[in-house]
């Protein structure tokens, strides 16, 4: 077996593209598309992978993070939960805008894949750009807001 070297984002998109479902006897992609607003935390990794896999997993430019996620929920409802849309945003306020939609998806049991922008993993985020400032927990970030509304 030959070793394949991929970035995490490329491996993720290859995996998502490989997922299929059957609708009316036809094999179709489980993830038919993705909405994206690029910024710090997702442009260098997910942006490049989405561009390279555009023919297999179409990407659509969003204008507001909450509307992207709510559109994905509407798509899942229209498809009777048989297909799942993806929404990705930068970290910071963009990620926070998707929290309400995550709650809507959870309470209505509708599938939605949210990929909020990544935050620093190996150092404290200084100088402060768009991070959550909590002096009692300096490692807390925006993505922690998704914990109560995700599974």
Residues covered by each model-derived region:
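N-terminal alpha/beta PP-like core and its mobile active-site loop of ThDP/TPP-dependent enzymes
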Residues: 2-151
């Amino acid at each position: 077996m030959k070793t394949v070297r991929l970035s995490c984002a490329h491996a993720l998109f290859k995996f998502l593209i490989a997922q299929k479902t059957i609708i009316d006897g036809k094999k179709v992609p489980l993830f038919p598309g993705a909405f994206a607003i690029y910024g710090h935390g997702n442009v260098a990794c997910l942006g490049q992978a989405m561009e390279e896999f555009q023919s297999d997993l179409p990407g659509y430019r969003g204008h507001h993070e909450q509307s992207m996620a709510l559109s994905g929920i509407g798509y899942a409802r229209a498809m009777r939960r048989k297909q799942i849309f993806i929404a990705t945003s930068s970290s910071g306020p963009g990620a926070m805008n998707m929290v309400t939609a995550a709650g809507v998806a959870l309470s209505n049991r509708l599938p939605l894949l949210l990929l909020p922008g990544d935050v620093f993993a190996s150092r404290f985020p200084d100088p402060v750009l768009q991070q959550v400032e909590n002096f009692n927990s300096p490692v807390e970030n925006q993505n922690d807001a998704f914990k109560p509304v995700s599974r």
